[in-house]
């Protein structure tokens, strides 16, 4: 089973918001200035990239979709540079020129892959007449599959409620990357994509996943949204919807060089996937994979379809990820030939939470490779009751396979994985909870083959049951 990319070429997305130009000055530094205790950078490279809403539009175009951008600029060299850069990558620019204001520009000075300083050139557009933007939006709405409102608090979205109403009237999904702590102004949007600090600035600190789900669900209902996607840095993303259980996606970033523009990539890929026909949960999975790619690059960057394809398929194509039993057995044989110690655990993993992640990380530390065997939907229903599983097998396995601690994910139909364990014969069999080792399914077979059986504790107070109760109490 593999996640597939949609046909992005059939998607058309409109981006409206605060456009800006990101300028980068690069050079070596080898001495301190005699004028002040600051490094001296000898600039040898100058680079210009579209930023803010323009970076969102770039991300959409990079996927091969039709990207249309509306924003406010000055009449200056920065506006010209911005237009030229965007048109060169097939972004359709529809700027409203404001002669009294400069184009928002951010200048970053970097040396040895480190940002030393940022200089901002800007003047807010809050009091600029919004009617020309409304007219452009109305003309575009009949032709698009999604509208992105990219808010950097520079004034282009000072009349954001009117824009939301226009999109809702046209039945076009409107996705917003919010700014500030007044989320009331985004009432009626389809989805907001705040980062964790932006979210907690509105609802208060969340001590755990349960509280995050509770407060986020309340916010979704209170603002008449359809969903909320909270980006959580090294903790991945959490999708909270009106009529669906929470979906927690672990980060896929291998190395983080620069988070500049990562939020633009998330909302750009999310909107494009939705416009191309993907359901929200799959669109979020693609956005999460794209974020993992882009933070490994320096500066505002985009993700190509090939990079995204590699991000979602790379592990499976190199012998990792979701597998059939036949594929798993061969992968285990190959691992043992490399001298690797194989660990195996199992469970329903219906709503993945921090307790699960911690448990799986601890299990992985017992060896070199970790297998997670997952109960099928029918098996989960027999064990947990008619209301379960909340998430279907395919989604549960996709989320598990994205965890860095997990190497192989395989489904099984029985109530216990005893047959599967007997076939695989892991070096270490692990189970979470208060079991005795001899009570664990497959323990006798593993011991007979010379393996170990371990019991690990779960984190107290975190459980799927508690999360479900929190949702029902809303």
Curated annotation (Swiss-Prot):
> Transferase as a keyword?
yes
Protein name, per record = Bifunctional protein HldE
Subunit architecture: Homodimer.
Q: Where is this region: Cytidylyltransferase?
A: 344-474
| NCBIfam families in alphabetical order | cyt_tran_rel, PRK11316.1, rfaE_dom_I, rfaE_dom_II
Q: Which residues, by range, are in coiled-coil regions?
A: none
Q: Which Gene3D superfamilies did the record assign?
A: 3.40.1190.20, HUPs
Looking at the keywords, is Nucleotide-binding present? yes
Reported function: Catalyzes the ADP transfer from ATP to D-glycero-beta-D-manno-heptose 1-phosphate, yielding ADP-D-glycero-beta-D-manno-heptose.
Q: Which pairs of Cys residues are joined through disulfide bonds in the record?
A: none
Q: Which domain of life is it from?
A: Bacteria
**Which family does the UniProt entry place this protein in?**
In the N-terminal section; belongs to the carbohydrate kinase PfkB family.
Return the SUPFAM superfamilies for the record.
Nucleotidylyl transferase (SSF52374), Ribokinase-like (SSF53613)
What pathway annotation does it carry?
Nucleotide-sugar biosynthesis; ADP-L-glycero-beta-D-manno-heptose biosynthesis; ADP-L-glycero-beta-D-manno-heptose from D-glycero-beta-D-manno-heptose 7-phosphate: step 1/4; Nucleotide-sugar biosynthesis; ADP-L-glycero-beta-D-manno-heptose biosynthesis; ADP-L-glycero-beta-D-manno-heptose from D-glycero-beta-D-manno-heptose 7-phosphate: step 3/4; Bacterial outer membrane biogenesis; LPS core biosynthesis
The residues listed in the UniProt record as binding ATP, with positions renumbered to this chain, are 195-198
Query: What PROSITE patterns does the record tag this protein with?
Result: PFKB_KINASES_1
- Tell me which EC number(s) this protein carries: 2.7.1.167, 2.7.7.70
Q: Which GO terms describe its cellular component?
A: cytosol
Please give the biological process terms from Gene Ontology that the record holds.
ADP-L-glycero-beta-D-manno-heptose biosynthetic process; lipopolysaccharide core region biosynthetic process
Catalytic function, reaction form? D-glycero-beta-D-manno-heptose 7-phosphate + ATP = D-glycero-beta-D-manno-heptose 1,7-bisphosphate + ADP + H(+); D-glycero-beta-D-manno-heptose 1-phosphate + ATP + H(+) = ADP-D-glycero-beta-D-manno-heptose + diphosphate
GO MF annotation terms? ATP binding; heptose 7-phosphate kinase activity; heptose-1-phosphate adenylyltransferase activity; phosphotransferase activity, alcohol group as acceptor
* Enzyme class per UniProt: transferase
Positions of the UniProt region annotated as Ribokinase = 1-318
Query: What residues form the catalytic site here?
Result: 264
Alphabetical UniProt keywords: ATP-binding, Carbohydrate metabolism, Kinase, Lipopolysaccharide biosynthesis, Multifunctional enzyme, Nucleotide-binding, Nucleotidyltransferase, Transferase
């Amino acid at each position: 089973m593999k996640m597939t990319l949609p046909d992005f070429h059939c998607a058309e997305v409109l981006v409206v918001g605060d456009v800006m130009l990101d300028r980068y000055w690069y050079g070596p530094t080898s001495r301190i200035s005699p004028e002040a205790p600051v490094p001296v950078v000898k600039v040898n490279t100058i680079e210009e990239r579209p930023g803010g809403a323009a970076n969102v539009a770039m991300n959409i175009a990079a996927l091969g979709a039709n990207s249309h951008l509306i924003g406010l600029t000055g009449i200056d060299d920065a506006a010209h540079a911005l237009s030229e850069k965007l048109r060169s990558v097939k972004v359709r620019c529809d700027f409203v020129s404001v002669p009294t204001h400069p184009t928002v520009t951010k200048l970053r000075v970097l040396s040895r892959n480190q940002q030393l300083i940022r200089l901002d050139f800007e003047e807010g557009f809050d009091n600029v007449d919004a009617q020309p933007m409304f007219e452009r939006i109305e003309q575009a709405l009949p032709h698009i599959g999604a509208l992105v409102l990219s808010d950097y608090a520079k004034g282009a979205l000072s009349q954001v409620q009117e824009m939301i109403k226009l999109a809702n009237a046209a039945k076009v999904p409107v996705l917003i990357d919010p700014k500030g702590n007044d989320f009331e102004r985004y009432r009626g949007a389809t989805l907001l994509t705040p980062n964790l600090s932006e979210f907690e600035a509105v609802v208060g600190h969340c001590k755990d996943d349960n509280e995050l789900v509770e407060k986020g669900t309340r916010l979704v209902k209170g603002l008449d949204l359809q969903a909320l996607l909270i980006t959580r840095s090294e903790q991945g993303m959490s999708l909270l919807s009106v009529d669906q259980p929470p979906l927690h996606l672990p980060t896929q970033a291998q190395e983080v060089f620069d988070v500049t523009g990562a939020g633009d990539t998330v909302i750009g890929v999310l909107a494009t996937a939705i416009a191309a026909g993907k359901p929200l949960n799959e669109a979020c999975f693609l956005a999460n994979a794209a974020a993992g790619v882009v933070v490994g690059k320096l500066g505002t960057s985009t993700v190509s379809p090939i990079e995204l394809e590699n991000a979602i398929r790379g592990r499976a194509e190199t012998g990792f990820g979701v597998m059939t039993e036949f594929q798993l057995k061969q992968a285990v044989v190959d691992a043992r030939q490399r001298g690797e110690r194989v660990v195996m655990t199992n469970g329903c993993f219906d709503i993945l939470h921090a307790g699960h992640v911690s448990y799986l990380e601890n299990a992985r530390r017992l060896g070199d490779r970790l297998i997670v065997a997952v109960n099928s939907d029918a098996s989960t229903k027999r064990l947990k009751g008619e209301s379960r599983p909340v998430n279907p097998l395919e989604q549960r396995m996709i989320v598990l396979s994205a965890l860095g601690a997990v190497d192989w994910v395989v489904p099984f139909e029985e109530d216990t994985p005893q047959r599967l364990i007997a076939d695989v014969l892991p070096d270490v069999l692990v189970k979470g909870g208060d079991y005795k080792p001899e009570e664990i399914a497959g323990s006798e077979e593993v011991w007979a083959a010379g393996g170990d059986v371990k019991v690990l504790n779960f984190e107290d107070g975190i459980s799927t049951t508690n999360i479900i109760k929190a949702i029902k109490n809303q």
